[in-house]
Amino acid sequence: MIWDKLEPIINRLEDDHTTDDWRRLFDKWAGHTWHDHEAPSELTSVLIVDANAVTTDGTQDLDALHTLLKDHVRSSISDLYLVSLFPHQVKPTDTAVNPRIRLFEDLGRFHDEFDLMYEMTPDVYNELQVDLLDETDAFIERLAQGATKVRVHVQSFRGMPEERIKHVLELWQLILHHYKPHGQLVLAYEGDADRTGSYFEVADVICHFDLASHTLLAFAQGNAKGLTEWADRIEAPGDGKTYFNFLSSPERDPFEKNLLEPSVDMLLAAHSVLFSLQGIPAVDYRTLLGVTTPVERAALVQELKTDPYRLQVFSGILSQLNVKRTHTAFSPYAEQRIVATDKRVFTVERSGGGETLLLYTNVSDDRVVIAASGTNLFTGEWVEAVVLEAYDFMWLKQE
C-alpha cells in the first residue's frame, strides 16, 4: 500500500492538513489507469519545446505542434519537455469544457508517441504560505497527464528550509515511482555545486546548469581546458541516478545567441559535447528549428526546407542523435571518463553494454590530429588517426 510508505514522510512535513485529508487525496487518484514507460536508455533524449511554439491562424495549437514533431523528430527524439503548458489555455469552442479534461485530450496524442516531461512550479511564498496538499495534487495530475519526468526547481520553494524542501521532494519522488516505476524526478538546482550531490537522495536526475557556460567559454577561447577540468570534477552518480544535460534552458536565451558567429560547424560541435557526457541530453527547439517566436506549422516546415543554415543544423543534430541511439555506451547510466588529449579538444570515454567509445570534439578553428584508432561511428570506417578540422568532431568505437 502506498500509504504505508507515505505516512512517515507526511508526518515529518508538519503540514496543516490532517491524515484524513491526505488519504482522501490518494483515494481520489486510486481509480486512475496508470501507464508506465520504458526505462531511460541510449534511446532517451529530450526536446525542450514551448507548448505555444506552433500556431494556427496566430493561436496556440497543440495539434499542429504534435503533427510537426510526429512527422519530423519522432524517429530521433524520445521525449518532449513541454514548457509553458500550465495553466493550459484551451481553444475556444461553442461548449464549455473543463480545461483539465481538454488538456488530457490534447496531450493524449503526444504520449502515444513520446515520453513527456512537465515542469512543476510550486506556489510557494514562504514556509508558511504553501498548500502542500494542493501542490501534491497538482504533481499527481501531471503524472496523470502523461508525464514520465517532472522537473522541479529548488529555488521555487522560496523561504522554505532545505530540510523541509527535501522532505517534499522525497514525498513526490515516492509518489512518482509508485505510479510510474520508470519515471524520473528531475531536479533543477542552481546553488552551491558542492551541495548538488546531496539532492540525489530525493531526486533521480539533477540538471547541469554549468555545462552551457563552460561550453560557451571553450568555443570563445578555442580551448577546452576549462571544460575538461569542470567535467572531470563531476561526481559519478549512484546506481539509477544520472544528470540532465542541456546547452540552453527555458529560462535563458538559446545557446547560439551567446556566440559571436554561430556557424553550423560550431553548433554541431557544441552538441557533440552535449551528447558525449553522461546523462540525459536535452535539445532546445529554438536551436533545432531555428525559431525564437511562435510560428505557423506550414511556414516553419517550408523555412526548414529552404534555409540551408537551419536545415544543416536541424539534420546535423538529428544525425548525431540517430547514432547515439544505436550504442549502449551512450546510456545515461554508462560510465564516463574525461580524457586529456589536446587543449583544443574535449574528449570523453564512455563505457557500457560491452562497448567503449572515445568521443572527440574540436572547440577551436585549428586543424588537430590525435593519435588514436577505432571505427568512426558516422561512416563505419576504421581510422588510424583522429583528424579534426575546425569545429569538427569524431566518435570512435574501440575494438
Where are these regions (language model features)?
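Active-site and adjacent substrate-binding regions of carbohydrate-active enzymes
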Residues: M1-S373, T379-E399
